[in-house]
């Protein structure tokens, strides 16, 4: 789960980490008022669920409240395109207006979950700012990575070694040690999968300030934090992903034309690979889970059909706990009810597979049966390559 920068900064401030003075604004007049309260000279930052805002023109400096208001009018309501949003961009509905900070140095600091080691990692670099991705790609030796032992946690000596590695000495080093330990405490107490400060700046006055921050929460821990749903900005999410979440479906929108419905995350990832190998481009990742009902399968299929980029659908099911006849009934309910004319290829195996296939054959829908995963992928790709289909009305 993602949140905005201003929300992440409020959380960090609660753990004793210094942040710039700032105000959140929803319109130009609020931006002008915030700029006036901050002394006129201020930074205006678009709030979207993506990084790279500086390169996309989403972070601007205003010299006075009037200019701040004009910048707000330029940003609000527009789609901000960054290297992380894709070409469609994300709509700007909120702005963070902050004081200007005199910066002496920019550092990078984050703690994130390393999927390979299944442990948290402390990542630090003496070269923070907008180009940290380029540094990671071209000069990885400039980035320090410490894997944290989950049994003993992050220790003071490790935080001090990291601070010294950033070139900090004396009182500034001790301040950084405290900041790193507080960042780790925040990570654990708030069930984060990532906390990132970029840049962490050393001011001309000799203080450490979190100028920009990113925070994501572990979705599996959301039940422990009843306040988290109130932090979500649904305007930043794909409507289909929101609809899928209501039915406890794992859905991620992709850029292709072949809708995918699969049971099991591992099989879903393998399905995407097989489609790519066959020359197709998947339009989504959708996992209905291991014991979905007929109604849940139908809703999952309807979500796929609502995506206007989808020109065909590939269903890949292994029936263990899941019954193939229930999958077939759900597909038929959704496809026949919506008047869908898209080509559909279904590959299924396992529990009640013959009953499921028989239901599909007798449905009267444009459905083909794949003998195996590879055959199913090749069939749907071939059908899309030679047919021009009418859009599905769902």
Curated annotation (Swiss-Prot):
ATP binds at residues 45, 52-54, 98, 101, 106. This is Succinate--CoA ligase [ADP-forming] subunit beta. Its EC number is 6.2.1.5. GO terms for cellular component: cytosol; succinate-CoA ligase complex. The gene is sucC. Keywords: ATP-binding, Ligase, Magnesium, Metal-binding, Nucleotide-binding, Tricarboxylic acid cycle. The keyword Magnesium applies. It catalyses: succinate + ATP + CoA = succinyl-CoA + ADP + phosphate; GTP + succinate + CoA = succinyl-CoA + GDP + phosphate. Disulfide bonds: none annotated. It comes from Pelobacter propionicus (strain DSM 2379 / NBRC 103807 / OttBd1). Pathway: Carbohydrate metabolism; tricarboxylic acid cycle; succinate from succinyl-CoA (ligase route): step 1/1. Binds 1 Mg(2+) ion per subunit. Gene3D superfamilies: ATP-grasp fold, A domain, ATP-grasp fold, B domain, Succinyl-CoA synthetase domains. Belongs to the succinate/malate CoA ligase beta subunit family. The keyword Metal-binding applies. InterPro entries: ATP-grasp, ATP-grasp_succ-CoA_synth-type, ATP_grasp_subdomain_1, Succ-CoA_synthase_bsu_CS, SUCC_ACL_C, Succ_CoA_ligase-like_bsu, Succinyl-CoA_synth-like.
